[in-house]
């Protein structure tokens, strides 16, 4: 279905566009212009000068609306995702705190299933841990924190293509090898819950780490 929003203040990469229009087909943006001329065949929505912005992409989210992604169930995933979809989020990376392998696999199975649905808002799974610095655990579960182990993470990565981001503390033994491996598989490596110094971060960058999570 073709839809056109007119008479809107639109946020674009170049700034705000006043009195513009947004043309969409099946909820996908086709065109943004500063012309309010109606497109033949489109359902018109008059924004009456209100703001129109692209949908939010939630890259770090542990749950919502009473649903916790750590539960790993479809019910928990859908509850949390629907809660965020009601408030402007259109894409989401469900996030797990430090978990056991069975917990990761349960969530990965659910995530894979939801990603396969038409027009799914789920873009992939984010693992915040469990290869973190114990001294910087914060709200993480310390009993699940450990050093990177290729005998553990390689089978996980090979089995679950839904994993798109994985966080680690680069000062841990084996963390550089871990970063090189996962980035070679197309997974974003992020520095997190760490006591890394400058040289550690520099080495991490050279080993594929390109993002940061929870520095404190």
Q: How would you label these PLM feature ranges?
A:
Residues 1-4, 10-53:
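Histidine-rich, glycine-flanked metal-binding segment
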Residues 62, 78-107, 120-133, 160-171, ...:
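Divalent metal-dependent hydrolysis catalytic cores, especially in the metallo-beta-lactamase
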Residues 81, 105-112, 153, 179:
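Generic structural signal for well-ordered alpha-helices
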Residues 40-48, 107-119, 199-206:
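Short amphipathic alpha-helices and their capping/turn segments at secondary-structure boundaries
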Residues 116, 145-215:
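Histidine/acidic residue-rich metal-binding segments in metalloenzymes
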Residues 8, 22, 27, 49, ...:
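Divalent metal-coordination and catalytic microenvironments
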């Amino acid at each position: 279905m073709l839809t056109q929003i007119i008479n809107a203040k639109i946020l674009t990469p170049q700034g705000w566009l006043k009195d513009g229009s947004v043309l969409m087909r099946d909820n996908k943006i086709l065109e943004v212009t500063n012309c309010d001329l109606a497109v033949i065949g489109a359902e018109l929505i008059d924004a009456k000068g209100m703001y129109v912005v692209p949908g939010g992409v939630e890259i770090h989210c542990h749950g919502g609306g009473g649903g916790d992604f750590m539960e790993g169930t479809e019910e928990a995933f859908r509850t949390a995702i629907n809660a965020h979809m009601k408030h402007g989020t259109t894409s989401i990376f469900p996030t797990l705190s430090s978990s056991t392998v069975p917990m990761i696999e349960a969530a990965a199975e659910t995530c894979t299933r939801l990603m396969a649905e038409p027009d799914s808002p789920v873009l992939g799974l984010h693992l915040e841990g469990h290869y973190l610095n114990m001294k910087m655990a914060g709200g993480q579960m310390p009993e699940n924190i450990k050093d990177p182990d290729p005998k553990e993470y390689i089978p996980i990565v090979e089995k679950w293509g839904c994993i798109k981001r994985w966080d680690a503390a680069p000062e841990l033994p084996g963390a550089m090898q871990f970063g090189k491996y996962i980035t070679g598989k197309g997974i974003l490596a992020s520095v997190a819950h760490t006591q890394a110094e400058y040289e550690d971060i520099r080495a991490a960058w050279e080993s594929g780490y390109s993002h940061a999570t929870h520095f404190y």
